[in-house]
């Protein structure tokens, strides 16, 4: 599956930017509390609402680092299921789709085990100094990622104008299985 990902955070940055759907702007949310930096470009899929009330997140693996707000064509190769401080926070995993160096990568196994371990390690540790708990439930294939994307597109259509906290509370009641670690 090929999608456009809007970059929030460049690769190797320790600045946590956040997109605000109401203002349509990206702003600085915080500086990461520790020494961690994002291992890959990090962004979102504008038309898809994840179960945490934010746009569906996506990592874009590329040699380059892209500025916040830039749209990058990406090939989705899988996903990482994650619970962040009690909320579902799925990360689609993709590679840049306009660089011939990445044309051979079609699934997570093409990345290699070490790259996946780096991604998992970053997300397991980047909030430790904030005393927030992150649970990685595991990696999923591209078919699972496509299904999750389609589900999140439907959530955006139905609930995209709803307040974030109201949405999360409603979803926790209606779909408690989505919030279990």
Swiss-Prot record:
CDD domains for the chain: pyrophosphatase
Compartments (UniProt record): Cytoplasm
Cofactor(s) named in the record: Mg(2+)
Molecular function via GO: inorganic diphosphate phosphatase activity; magnesium ion binding
Chain sites annotated for binding Mg(2+) 2: 57
Main localization, broad class: cytoplasm
Protein name per UniProt: Inorganic pyrophosphatase
Organism annotation: Malacoplasma penetrans (strain HF-2) (Mycoplasma penetrans)
């Amino acid at each position: 599956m090929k999608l456009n990902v809007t970059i929030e955070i460049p690769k190797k940055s320790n600045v946590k930017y956040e997109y605000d759907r109401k203002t349509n702007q990206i702003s600085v949310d915080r500086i990461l509390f520790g020494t961690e930096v994002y291992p890959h470009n990090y962004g979102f899929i504008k038309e898809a609402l994840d179960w945490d009330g934010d746009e569906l997140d996506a990592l874009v693996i590329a040699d380059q680092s892209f500025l916040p707000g830039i749209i990058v064509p990406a090939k989705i190769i899988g996903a990482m299921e994650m619970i962040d401080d009690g909320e579902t926070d799925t990360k689609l995993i993709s590679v840049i789709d306009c660089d011939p160096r990445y044309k051979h990568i079609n699934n997570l196994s093409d990345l290699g085990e070490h790259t996946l371990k780096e991604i998992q390690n970053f997300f397991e540790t980047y909030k430790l100094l904030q005393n927030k708990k992150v649970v990685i439930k595991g990696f999923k294939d591209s078919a699972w990622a496509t299904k999750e994307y389609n589900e999140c597109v439907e959530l955006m259509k139905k609930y995209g104008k709803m307040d974030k906290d109201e949405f999360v509370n409603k979803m926790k009641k209606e779909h408690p299985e989505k919030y279990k670690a």
